[in-house]
C-alpha cells in the first residue's frame, strides 16, 4: 500500500517496465535483422547458383542452316518414346504422317503412345537378343534413340545434400541403358541395314566436357561417361548418324529460337518440344550427317528458365 502511494516507487516501476519493453524490442530487432541477413544470403546463393549453371560464358556464332522437314520415306523406329523428349518427337513425326513404331520395355507406361495410336514393339534394350529380334522382324530404315536412365530407374533419388550426407547411391552400369542399351540398338541397326540414326545425348561428353557447368558435370559424371561410350560406338559403326547433345530441358513452351551448333562449348537449356523440332529437322538435312551438335537456345541461358512457361 505504501509503495502504491510512494511516487518514487511508482516512477521506478515505470522505468522498469520501460526497460523491459526496450529489451524485448531489441530482441525483436535482432531477430528481424538476422532474418534480413539470412534472406540476403539466400538470394545471393540462389543467384550465384543460377549464374554458375548458366550458358553465358560462351556464345556460338555458327549454326546448322535451318531446312524444311524432309521425310526419310521409310519406316522409323523410336526408342525412348514413352516420355519426355522422345514423346515430343513421336508427336512431331505423327504430325508429318510418318510410319512410326516405338520400341518399349515390358514395364513401360505406354498409355500416351496408345492414345496417339502409335505402333509398339516390346523389347528390353539391355537384352541383345530381344533387340536383334525386333530389328530382324521389321524393315526399319531410320532409328531415333533418346534412350537413357530415367529418375525412376535409379535405386534412390538424391539431391546434392543427401548425397553428401548419406553417400552417393550408384546404379550398376550394366543395368543402365545409356551405353549397353544404345550399343545393342546401334549394332542391330547396322546389321539390318538402317539408313539413318539420330542419337539424343547430353552436353558434357567428349569435346563438350567443359561446356557443362561444373556442378552438373560432377552430379552426372556416371551417365556422361556412359553416353560418351555410346556416342563413340555410333561413330565407329559406319551408320549415317547425327548426334544431338542437350543441356537441361524443360516442359515449357517452344521459344522457336533453338538451333544446332558444332561449337562444342555452347551450353543452354532448352524446351523438349524444341529438341523434337531440331531432331526431325536434322533427319532430312544432309548437312547434319555424321556430325555432332550441341542444342542451343539463346533465350534459355539461365537455369530459372527451366521452370518458366
Language model: regions and residue ranges:
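N-terminal Sec-pathway targeting helices
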Residues: 22-41
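Conserved cofactor-binding/catalytic machinery of classical short-chain dehydrogenase/reductase
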Residues: 127, 181, 230, 271-274
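Membrane-interface motif at the C-terminal end of an N-terminal transmembrane signal
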Residues: 45-62
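Glycine-/Pro-rich loop/turn segments that contact NAD(P) or position catalytic residues
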Residues: 149-261
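NAD(P)H-binding glycine-rich loop region in Rossmannoid oxidoreductase-like domains
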Residues: 76-77, 102-191, 284
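Active-site-lining helix/loop region of Rossmann-like oxidoreductase modules
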Residues: 70, 81, 249-309
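N-terminal Rossmann NAD(P)H-binding glycine-rich loop of SDR-like oxidoreductase domains
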Residues: 76-98
